[in-house]
Amino acid sequence: MPETPSPGPPMPKTPAPGANGTAALEVMGLRKEFGPLVAVDDVSFGIPEAGSLAIVGESGSGKTTIARMIVGLERPTRGTIMACGHDRSRPTRSARARRRRGREVQIVFQDPYTSLDPRQSAEATIDEVLRLHHGWPADRRRARIAELIDLVGLDARQARALPRALSGGQRQRVAIARALAAEPRVLILDESVAALDVSIQAQVLNLLADIRDETRVSYILISHDLAVVRQLTDEAIDAPLIALAHALSVAGLPADRFRALAPGEVLEFQ
């Protein structure tokens, strides 16, 4: 059994900046209430450019609520969400601002079949995003579609297929390509490999690692699986307790030890 680490200093409130001096994402004092229920309370973290963070917890721990607030599907009761220097925690009615927010943060859900239009091929799905966010002419869009299809490891036949003709792993690759078409700084992966079998899961995780190296996108991984966290992320926070640890080591700890961390406690691993 691994040696129990001793607590380190309090959790830092200011994330490390990216290469350009601005963090890809900063979350400060985030709180979400649903009536009398407090789903998320005083969450703060940050991700540098090309960094990755896992939000770990069991069902009902608030991890998906955090993700939904970051992407803009829920409004926080209190707190600030900054992406690329822009405040996402405030509502906006400007179509231009909404498109900019879409270029800053994208999300890939657990079940791609329910998030893909069953009437659209992979090519058409990606083309729709390119037209919305970039407004490029058709020839440039076709070239970018081909690049993205190749990046996620699909072939020309699969690119022309409808979602029902693709496997679960192939549909997830389409969903990843669609998200990347907006050229986001941050990509949220909400249990995105949980429904895949182990071999396909490993392929998608390896793909995501390669994409991060190539595009410098930052990842937020929502997961209950510490093995997945260990493979893809640099650090992790426990959603209900807000405990921070290096993910490469935390997968070696007993799960009850990880959940028992005090709020704000930081663990240092050798």
Each language-model region and where it sits:
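The feature captures the beta-strand-to-loop junction immediately N-terminal to the Walker
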Residues: 56-58
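Helix-to-loop junction immediately C-terminal to a conserved catalytic motif
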Residues: 71
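Conserved ABC transporter NBD signature motif
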Residues: 79-90
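ABC ATPase NBD coupling module
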Residues: 88-106, 124, 132, 138-139
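Conserved ABC ATPase "signature" region
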Residues: 140-157, 210
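Conserved ABC ATPase signature
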Residues: 162-166, 170
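Conserved catalytic motifs of ABC-family nucleotide-binding domains
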Residues: 183
